[in-house]
Amino acid sequence: GRIGKAKLHTADSSNHWEYSQERFMENMAESAKATTDFFGKQIIYINVLRNMSVDCDCAGLAAAPPTTPDIGILASTDILAVDQASIDLVFALPDAAKHDLQERIESRRGLRQLSYMKELSMGNDQYELITIE
C-alpha cells in the first residue's frame, strides 16, 4: 500500500523528501529476497530489455522516452544472474546508446542492488548467455 511504498522509497526515513539512494537499493533487494525466499525454486525471472527509459516503470506515461535500443529478453532461475546479465548487456552498448541509462543507473546507485543481492546470497553473478533465435 501507500505506506509500504513510502517506506521502501524513503528507506523508512521520517522525512519523505530526503533518503539514501543506497539504502533504497538495499530495500529493493530485501523485498526481492522476501519474495524469492517465499517461492523458493518455483519461480523464473524474466527481464525484458525493450523500450528502456531512464525513469522508473511507476512513472507510466510520464516517463522519459526510451533512448536505449531494444536488447532482448532474458530469463533465468537465478535472479542475480539475470539482473547482472541485463546490466552487462546495457553497459556493453556503444556509448551513445547507453549513456543516459548508464548515467541514471550509476547516479542513483543502482549497482548497489546487485552487490547487495550477492551479499544476501540471492544468486550467482556469473552466468552463461544462451541465444535463442
Where are the regions that the model predicts?
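Extended, low-polarity segments enriched in aliphatic/aromatic residues
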Residues: 1-133
